[in-house]
C-alpha cells in the first residue's frame, strides 16, 4: 500500500438500486420491506474498497474486520442508495473509515 500520508483522506463511492431481494422481509430478517442492514454494510464496504483502489499495490486487497452501524432511516425496493467512505485513520495495517449511506441527492 502507498504511504499512510497519501492514503489518509482517500474517498470512495458505491451505488445500489435496491431490489426486492435486498429487503429485510425477503432475507427473513423481519417483516419490513426495507433495505436489510447487511445490504447497507456491503454497500459501505464496497465504497471503502473503492477508496483504496489507487493506493493498493498489485496483489493487495482489504477486508472488513470490524464495523459499527447506526441506521437512522430506511429505503425500499426501487430506490437508489449511495455510500461514501473516507479513510480517517491509519494505524499500521488497520484503516478506519467514516461511511454514510443516503438515498437521493445530498
Tell what function each PLM region has:
Residues 48-82:
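Hydrophobic beta-strand-centered segment that forms part of the acyl-chain substrate-binding groove
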Amino acid at each position: 500500500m502507498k504511504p499512510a500520508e497519501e492514503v489518509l483522506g482517500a474517498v470512495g463511492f458505491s451505488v445500489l438500486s435496491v431490489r426486492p431481494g435486498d429487503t429485510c422481509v425477503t432475507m427473513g430478517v423481519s417483516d419490513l420491506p426495507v433495505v436489510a442492514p447487511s445490504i447497507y454494510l456491503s454497500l459501505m464496504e464496497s465504497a471503502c474498497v473503492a477508496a483504496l483502489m489507487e493506493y493498493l499495490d498489485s496483489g493487495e486487497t482489504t477486508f472488513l474486520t470490524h464495523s459499527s452501524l447506526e441506521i437512522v432511516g430506511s429505503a425500499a425496493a426501487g430506490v437508489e442508495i449511495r455510500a461514501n467512505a473516507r479513510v480517517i485513520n491509519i494505524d499500521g495495517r488497520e484503516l478506519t473509515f467514516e461511511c454514510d449511506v443516503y438515498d437521493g441527492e445530498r
